[in-house]
Amino acid sequence: HVLMSSVSDGFSLLSYKGVAVVPIGKPTLEGYRLIFRDASVWISYKNTIIYVAGTVGLGFVLNVLGGYALSQPTKGKGIMYGFLFVTMLFSGGIVPTYMVMNTLGLTGSRLSIILLEATQTFYLIFAAKAFAAVPLSTVEAARIDGAGHLRVMFQIMLPQAKGMFFITLLNTFVGAWNSWYNASIYVPSDKTKWPIQLFINEMTSANVNFLETATPNYSRYLIQFAVIVVA
């Protein structure tokens, strides 16, 4: 429906009430033209790629290092699990998080978005459980051969837990690509740092307001469908 609506005639689509399985009226690419003639959409795509790459990369490092540390038979591991579990159930909240970011001087920067979305407690515990499932005999054999923590982690344990990390990376990627809420809080006025989803949210809202005017251009009604396909 969304794809067919995005290439339909705006006036005909506005009066159509059913599900579009074929283009309504004369097919047109007007909605896509209106989007891509604006340089802001390309800037938003660039920002989204930066956010996704930074979030996935940093999240991978944090999950691997944190998961490996939690999987080791060290004292106080149960207490650490308890702290992590509490943070998974009860977050600090938007205002305290914003105050921390503001104190660190990160508000208004891309780094604030990346740090907030890099990892979740669930992924960290998931990584620890995956590392703990690696046979202890394999790890001990590697250490007898002189392997240190980094070699054991990356060459012995990580390959055996790659399925878990693939799922984690995929979820992190999807979450980072679709994220817009943090950007609306930490970079609300700097459109040069907006991700594509926040840009689409503003464009769709502006399009709705435009259609409520006395003499709307019905071609712009296509934007709300075209931007979904583009995203």
Task: Locate the predicted segments by residue.
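A hydrophobic, multi-pass inner-membrane permease signature
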Residues: 1-231
